[in-house]
Amino acid sequence: MGYVRMRRAAIALAVAASLLVCATAGAAEPRPGITFAAVGDTMLGNSPELPADPGTYLDAVKGQLRGEVVFGNLEGTLTDVSSSPKCGGSSGGSCYAFRTPPSYARHLAAAGFTVMNDANNHSYDFGKAGLEQTVAALHDAGIAQTGLPGEITVTKAGGEKVAFVGFAPYSLTASLLDLPAARKLIRRAARRAKIVVVAIHAGAEGSDAQHVTGAEEHYLGEDRGNPRKFARMAVRSGADLVLGSGPHVLRGMEIYRDRLIAYSLGNFSGFHNFATVGDLGASAVLHVSLDRDGPFRS
């Protein structure tokens, strides 16, 4: 009897082990997350002061600009238009109008960039013609662009559709000062893609603007919005990742409803056109992985 019981027990264990192996073999492996690399304010000079070799200017950081999406805020234009309506026909002095040749778009692409945000205070530095040339140059280089009024840019990453919407406190961009309109635009983006990334060019500027106040922020008398209020509204409306730029310093991050908000990624590249004294010289490349339905993974 003891032998029979033991034999039956052994058979039962063997069957259970076999079922466990089959179940494990049949279980689907977790799908990898979608990877992003993101940086803040980016330009490769300001004509006529340009790098001697623009093709190698970003070589030292190329290895960090790796992800299924590589994102930056284009703090300037890609144009050969030389007259700036913003500065009364010229740039310099206390008026800042930034441009590099349209051909520089290919250097951004070679460095790894796949998406650039144009919703900022420099996208119209050289008027409508300058902006149109910028958009065309990015397109020709294979870089997606976002940030114009009502614009939703959809790309693919990791086999999923990813929508980008850029906001800044200006009427010539998708405005972050009009919360109802912004909410509608983000919801539209969420209906068009699995993942929604919202870029915000918001908040005060300078070394004393490192902290998110939770209130309306201003710079030189200009309303730069309430970054925290806007970013959290964006998440509630469907954003899965919020990427901030504009203050020219690094700011904090938070996880809100399982979504990452990076309030400012600081200065990334300026070729002597950004102040880099003290905290203004701190930069970063943000590496993020999101689950395929949006939540922050790592």
Task: Go through each PLM region and give its residues.
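Acidic, metal/ion-coordinating pockets
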Residues: 26-298
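Bacterial N-terminal signal peptides that target proteins for export
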Residues: 2-13
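A general, composition-driven signal for non-globular sequence regions
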Residues: 1-2, 195
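Bacterial N-terminal signal peptides
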Residues: 12-22
